[in-house]
Amino acid sequence: TYVGQKFQDNNPNAALYIHAGSGQLDQEAAADAVIDGGIKYMRGFAMNVSSSGTTPVEEEWAEQFVKTLEAKGVAGKHYVVDTSRNGVALQGDSNPGGKFLTCNNPTAAVGTRPTSNTTGAHADAYVWAKPVGESDGVCHPGDPDAGKFFPDLAVKVVQNGVTAGTIEYWE
């Protein structure tokens, strides 16, 4: 709450979005968390940061979440979707040896390039919030620590995006 209020007081033109998680979360619990976090001082919420939920799934959840927030007295909120790793729907067996499905998953693919051309009624933009190639941590033997640049993963995730058709190859 403090950060949102300070930004609003000192830079009212800043568009802030609080992370609301991803489309697997319980709407009521997520709403309580972002309300406690000060969403009333922000433009809205961010979806799917560092995760792999597909854009249609995340937008469907987010559009319902806007209604959940309205029912709790917080109206007029918008959202952004992190598409940096959601170019393909990841399957439960697509990250063999990985700690979690999304942890440095070599089958992940970049999704839609950042744009304000969205399909959700309350979606402001698709963004790449998680830097492509940033390690989630030592998920497989030899992976770098969390937050370190991981060139092999960056190349693979971009190549997968080109193969999936979520981005085009530039020469």
Question: What is the role of each PLM region?
Answer:
Residues 167-168:
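Long, compositionally biased low-complexity segments
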Residues 3-6, 13-15:
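A non-catalytic structural micro-motif
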Residues 6, 10, 23-156:
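Surface-exposed substrate-engagement region within the catalytic domains
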